[in-house]
A protein has these predicted regions:
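Glycine-rich phosphate-binding loop plus the immediately following alpha-helix
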Residues: 174-181, 192, 207, 212-244, ...
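Short beta-strand-loop/turn "lid" adjacent to the catalytic site in phosphate-handling enzymes
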Residues: 124-171, 189, 197-209
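Glycine-rich phosphate-binding loops at beta-strand->alpha-helix junctions
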Residues: 361-380
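Structural signal for terminal/edge beta-strands and the immediately following C-terminal loop/tail
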Residues: 394-426
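Conserved phosphate-binding/catalytic loops in two-lobed NTP-binding clefts
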Residues: 374, 378-404
Length: 426
């Protein structure tokens, strides 16, 4: 990495980890709910170590603000990504891949908890890493009810809630349970950061024309917010709260978020206005209703089209954008039509968010794995540059974002948030 980039990266993390407000000391009476495999609920007092490691009892000097050791966990459908950070520095990372044969015995994603925890423990042992060094664990957050952005302390009720999600349960639901089970014997706090269900949408944006259905957010909140924060710090050189940004994440799925005043005030879900390599979206409703009642497909099959078997998979038989671009380079006109159609649908969605921002947008940010493609960058830059300059920030920085979120809490820059059940379920 060049000197300039090193300086920018260091500056970014220094600003994000600086202590800004004191968080009161925790007390043993508060208690910490733990989860065990029998799911027999019990409350254990907060150990002294938790107060020492978990929540600072006094502001830290700025020169110690990057010393916390964090294990981060990002569970996906066929892999679990882990990394250990000491402040902003990544000590090591690894993608633990799970074969179809390994996952075959599990009929529901939450049945994989013991399997994935064992895989993580073996990987840490293989790196000869002493978990006693850890100050906290932060995992990708799952399908919680709509919530604010931020870093959440993982408590028993959050882990329990993941077990109530039976329909279309996502692998991210494993994150908080894995973090809590690994943190329990170490007496350190477990966190999640910017879960997929972050929803700060304005009320007028929720109206659909049918009272029974309100728009909600769902998508790549963690990476979108990380890229928005990074663009604000490194490109615009001002706080995220002072920026107006649109972030488009393009991966196996696609979603977009509009940031105003530091909040995600509107967005496009991965099942809404655009389609993606594995997602169906952007269709008129009447044909969808007719297909649902045609008798041709079950509810599960229709749901699979929305996430998993739609998009490029349905048209071209593959979700691999690199393969599709190779077909285009080889003269496959159908592949070009479908691929361009996917990018067109994304550009159209971004245009809608720009209108929601009154046309006042500082940057449009392209991120996710597909943003590595020069073809994609050129197509979308041409379509979107009339709105605002387009920043290409490819890849995913979810591991870094998880570590940064935990550090901001552990160093006293932010207060941890607490999960609350929806009123109807409390």
């Amino acid at each position: 990495m060049g000197t300039a980039k090193c300086f920018i990266a260091a500056n970014f993390f220094r600003r994000n980890f600086m202590v800004r407000e004191r968080i009161p000391a925790c007390t043993g009476a508060a208690g910490l709910l733990y989860y065990n495999k029998t799911r027999a609920h019990r409350q254990m007092p907060l150990p002294t170590e938790y107060c020492r490691k978990g929540v600072p009892d006094a502001p830290r000097p700025a020169d110690t603000a990057m010393s916390k050791c964090i294990l981060v966990i990002n569970p996906g459908s066929t892999s679990t990504k882990i990394a250990v950070f000491r402040g902003a520095e990544k000590v090591f990372d690894e993608t633990l891949r799970h074969s179809r044969e390994e996952l075959a015995p599990f009929h529901w994603v939450m049945e994989q908890v013991d399997f994935r925890r064992a895989v993580i423990e073996r990987a840490l042992a293989a790196h000869d890493f002493d978990t006693a060094q850890l100050d906290g664990i932060c995992a990708r957050g799952g399908q919680l009810p709509p919530c604010e952005s931020g870093t959440y302390l993982v408590e028993q009720r959050m882990a329990d809630y993941m077990y109530t999600i039976k329909h279309a349960a996502h692998a991210s639901n494993l994150g908080c349970v894995l973090a809590l089970e690994l943190a329990q014997p170490l007496h350190i706090p477990a966190f999640i950061c910017d879960p997929v269900s972050v929803d700060e949408m304005t009320e007028e944006a929720r109206i659909t024309g049918l009272p029974e259905i309100r728009r909600t957010m769902l998508g790549h909140a963690l990476n979108c917010r990380a890229m928005a924060r990074r663009c604000a710090e490194e490109v615009l050189h001002k706080p995220l709260e002072d920026c107006r940004l649109i972030v488009l994440h393009l991966g196996g799925g696609a979603s977009a978020r509009l940031f105003i005043g530091g909040k995600m005030v509107d967005g496009v879900r991965d099942d809404e206005w655009m389609f993606a390599p594995e997602r169906f979206g952007g269709a008129s409703l009447q044909p969808v209703v007719r297909l649902c009642y045609s008798g041709k497909y079950t509810e599960k099959e229709m749901t699979d089209f929305i996430r998993g078997k739609g998009g490029l998979v349905a048209y071209l038989g593959t979700a691999d954008a690199r393969e599709v671009e190779k077909r285009i380079a080889d003269g496959d006109a159908q592949a070009k039509l479908i691929y361009d159609g996917m990018l067109y649908s994304a550009a159209r969605a971004i245009g809608g968010l720009a209108a929601a921002a009154d046309g006042q947008v500082d940057r449009v940010i392209l991120t996710g794995g597909i943003a590595h493609s020069k073809y994609v960058a050129a197509y979308l830059t041409k379509k979107l540059s009339f709105i605002a300059p387009v920043e290409i920030m490819p890849g995913e920085f979810e591991l870094e974002a998880l570590a940064a979120g935990a550090c901001r809490v552990l160093e006293g820059q932010e207060r941890p948030k607490h999960f609350a059940l929806p009123t109807a379920q409390a």
